C-alpha cells in the first residue's frame, strides 16, 4: 500500500507517521509538507521523517499531480490549523484549508486513489446548547478555521469521486505529546503552565464545553479511515471522532491538571463574559463504525504523558506562548525574517538561507 500524508511534519502528522509505519510496516509512506514547522521538534532524537520512504517539500496549493500516481490512500492533514491562525490569515485559511483540500480530493479521485481521509473538526458545531451534537445536527462555524472545514466537507459531496471513498473525521480538540509538540491547545497549554509557572489561569469562567482526543488516538482513527470500505458508513462520510467520556468543561481540565502536577494553583475568571465556543459532541456513530479505533488514552494519561515529556525536556519556559511551540508565533517569525510572504508562501531568499530542500 502506498500512502501520501500531507502535513506530515506537524503535530498530528509526526505521530501518524509512526503509527502508520507500525500498522503497515511494508507500506510505502510519502510525506508532503511545506516545512514551516520542521524545526519545531520536541527533541533532537525524534525525527519522524526517518520512518518515511520519501519526503517531498511543497505548497499544498500547488501539489504536483504526479505525486498521486500509484497512491492508494491520502491522509490529508495540511491546514492553517487553529482559530488564532485562522483569524490572522483568514484569506489564506480559505485557500489552504478549503480550496486546496477540495482540489486535492478531486485530483486524488482522478488518479485512482481508493481512500481519502480529511482531518475535519468538531469546532464546526460552534455554540451548541442542549444535548451533544450529532453529525446530522446543524453546524454553527464561528471562525475561519471552522468555516473552512465544513465548507470542505460539503464540497467533497459534490465531487466526481469515481471509486474513491472519502472520510471526514470531525476530530475533538487535540491534546497529548508529539514529536512536534504544540502548546497552543487547551490541555497542552494548561500542563505547560503548571510545569513552568505552577499556576493555571483560565481566562474564561471555565464553563465552556470541549471534547478532547489524544493525538495518539487521532492517528489510530486515521489508520481506520484509510482502510474504510464504502459499505461501512457510505462513500462520503463525515463522522465525529472522539468518545462521549471525552467531553469536559474547561475548568474540569484545569482541575485535572492541578491534581496531577503537585503545587499547581488554578485561577478562574468567574466574571468573564461567556465564551461563544462551547459544544458537547455525540460520538456514538464513530463507536458503531470503528469499535477498534475508539479512543483509548484517558484524560489523566494524556496529562501524565505531557507532564513526563515536558519534564524530560527540562521545560521551564514561563514565556512559552512566544515560543516555537505556538504555531502562530512561528509563522510570524518566518514573515518578519523575510522567509514567508503574507499569504504563507516561501520567498525566494529563503531557499538559500533557511528553507528545507526538496528530498527524493
Give the location of each predicted region:
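C-terminal substrate-binding subdomain of Rossmann-fold SDR/epimerase-dehydratase oxidoreductases
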Residues: 198, 203-360
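SDR active-site strand-loop-helix element
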Residues: 6, 32, 74-77, 116-122, ...
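NAD(P)-dependent short-chain dehydrogenase/reductase
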Residues: 154-210, 215-226, 255-259
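N-terminal Rossmann/SDR dinucleotide-binding element
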Residues: 1-73
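Conserved catalytic-core motifs of eukaryotic protein kinase domains, centered on the activation segment
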Residues: 41-42, 84-91, 127-131, 179-180
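NAD(P)H-binding glycine-rich loop region in Rossmannoid oxidoreductase-like domains
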Residues: 57-96
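Conserved Rossmann-fold NAD(P)-dependent oxidoreductase catalytic core, especially the SDR/UDP-sugar
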Residues: 102-144
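Active-site helix of classical SDR
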Residues: 148
